[in-house]
Each structure stands twice: as structure tokens, then as C-alpha cells.
A protein has these predicted regions:
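Sec-type signal peptide cleavage vicinity
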Residues: 2-5, 11-12, 19-269
Length: 269
């Protein structure tokens, strides 16, 4: 069999899909000591199973600051866990952020998915088998930030921090068996800096990532921004019990934060 490649770069525009404001019942929940909740939107780049919304029980880390100090100043609230329920991110009593008593406005930084390790600087690992369960969406690191506000339910507009890789397969003959696709010799660890909103790969580019199904003959993975290694980084395709087919990139390519890269492989007999 022969494999040839067609590559396409797709710049991801952040298209906000804003949820409606809190219902009257939800507003009633927010009065008094109930604290802050959040509505949310996601940049539309097809890296999630649900592209334009969060899913029930999704969890995020939330940081709060007085004014615009951000991580350069003192944190008002550190890594509070908020959970998505009924179109809102809310928290339990221990984690709920309360408005300052001095009427200061708060600005917020939020990160998906939630982790106790999330901080101004932290390390994040994408899942190595993104075909399993929620591993694909749990690999989709996202960040949101707001201007100072005294709103009881501000909106978090999330953007995707990593690179989205899509592999489309075109077979000369229908595949005789199940198809699986791996990205090989890639980095799976991200060094994140929330203060500067920068995300870069760290560690050796010697890992493999099993991609998730993306529709007929299409597969996808979320990977750290990185520069592929010519003749090393590549795509491995397995059809049924046959020996894997391997394609190595003939030139280096820089995968950038928040951009989707689509590759089409033509597989002859």
C-alpha cells in the first residue's frame, strides 16, 4: 500500500455561543450569600464532543482577583471547583466565590478541566488513549478570563489552548476490518502559564497518542503546541489484523495553540 498526504491548516475563530441569562429560579439562588455562578461559551473549533456547549458535570478551576491585578497581585480566590449543572457553573458552599464586602469588582480566570494542580503555572498531560471514554474532552485544555465586574453571573468565554489534529483517510478499497489511528513521536505534556496565556510542549517527543473517532474515516486528537520532527513524528494506521501503515512527516511543522491542522491520507491497494 502507498500513502500520500494532503495537509490543511484551519485557523480557529472564537465564535461565542452565549447561554441565556439565569432564569428567575436561578436568580433567586444567587441572592444573599449564594455567591457567584457563571454562564459559559466555547470557541467553535470542533475539538469537543459537544462543540458549542459544556456537558453536565464538567468541572473547571476558577481564580478571582480584585480589579485587574491578575496573577501579578494577590488572589482573592484560588482554584475553586465549579461544576456545570442546568446551564450554569456553580460551586458548593466551600468553593463558592462570594462578592467582596468593600464593593470591589472581581476579575476571573478559569481553566477546563479542573485539577487540584492548576495554578498560575502548571503542567498538563493530554491522554494517551483519546479513543476511550471522556479522554478526548479531558485532554482539551481551555482557558477563559474576564474584565473586572460586579455581575453575579458573569460569562466565561473559553478558548482552546492546545492544537487540534484531524486525520482523514481515503481508501482505494473499503477497509477490511476496524481502523485505528495513532499520532507517533509526539509530546504529550504541556507547560501552561496562565498569567501570559501561553502553552508549550515540554518533555521528549517520543510518545504515542491514540486518536478519537471523528466520523466516517476521520480521526482526531488534541496535542500540545509543538514543532514536529522531520522523519520522526508521524501517523500510524492499523486496519484489522494487518501490519500498521506508517507515514512520517517529510518536513517539520509548527502546531500552534488554538489551531486545527487537518491531514488527508490516501491509501492505495
Amino acid at each position: 500500500m502507498k500513502i500520500s498526504l494532503k495537509q490543511k491548516y484551519i485557523f480557529l475563530s472564537v465564535i461565542a455561543m452565549l447561554f441565556t441569562e439565569c432564569s428567575q429560579t436561578e436568580e433567586d439562588m444567587l441572592n444573599g450569600a449564594s455567591g457567584v455562578c457563571f454562564t459559559a461559551s466555547i470557541g467553535q473549533n470542533q475539538t469537543r464532543a459537544t462543540e458549542d456547549s459544556f456537558e453536565t458535570n464538567d468541572e473547571i478551576s476558577v481564580f478571582a482577583f480584585k480589579g485587574e491585578t491578575g496573577f501579578s497581585g494577590e488572589e482573592y480566590a484560588h482554584n475553586r471547583k465549579y461544576t456545570f449543572q442546568s446551564q450554569l457553573f456553580t460551586a458548593d458552599e466551600e468553593n463558592t466565590i462570594k462578592q467582596p464586602t468593600d464593593d470591589s469588582q472581581l476579575s476571573y480566570v478559569a481553566v477546563y478541566p479542573y485539577s487540584t494542580a492548576t495554578d498560575a503555572k502548571f503542567s498538563f498531560q493530554v491522554k494517551e488513549d483519546q479513543s476511550a471514554g471522556s479522554n478526548y474532552t479531558q485532554s482539551d485544555l481551555m482557558m477563559a478570563s474576564t474584565y473586572p465586574t460586579d455581575a453575579q453571573a458573569p460569562t466565561l468565554m473559553f478558548s482552546h489552548c492546545l492544537s487540534s489534529i484531524v486525520v482523514n483517510l481515503s481508501f482505494a478499497k473499503a477497509p477490511a476490518g476496524n481502523v485505528s489511528v495513532k499520532m507517533v513521536n509526539v509530546s504529550t505534556t504541556v507547560s501552561a502559564d496562565l498569567a501570559t496565556a501561553t502553552f508549550s510542549s515540554s518533555g521528549e517527543a517520543n510518545q504515542s497518542v491514540v486518536t478519537a473517532f471523528n466520523g466516517t474515516n476521520s480521526y482526531k486528537a488534541v496535542l500540545p503546541p509543538q514543532t514536529t520532527s522531520m522523519g520522526s513524528t508521524g501517523i500510524e494506521i492499523t486496519v484489522g489484523d494487518a501490519a500498521p501503515l506508517s507515514y512520517k512527516f517529510p518536513a517539520s511543522c509548527e502546531w500552534k495553540s488554538g489551531i486545527r491542522y487537518a491531514y488527508t491520507l490516501y491509501i492505495a491497494e
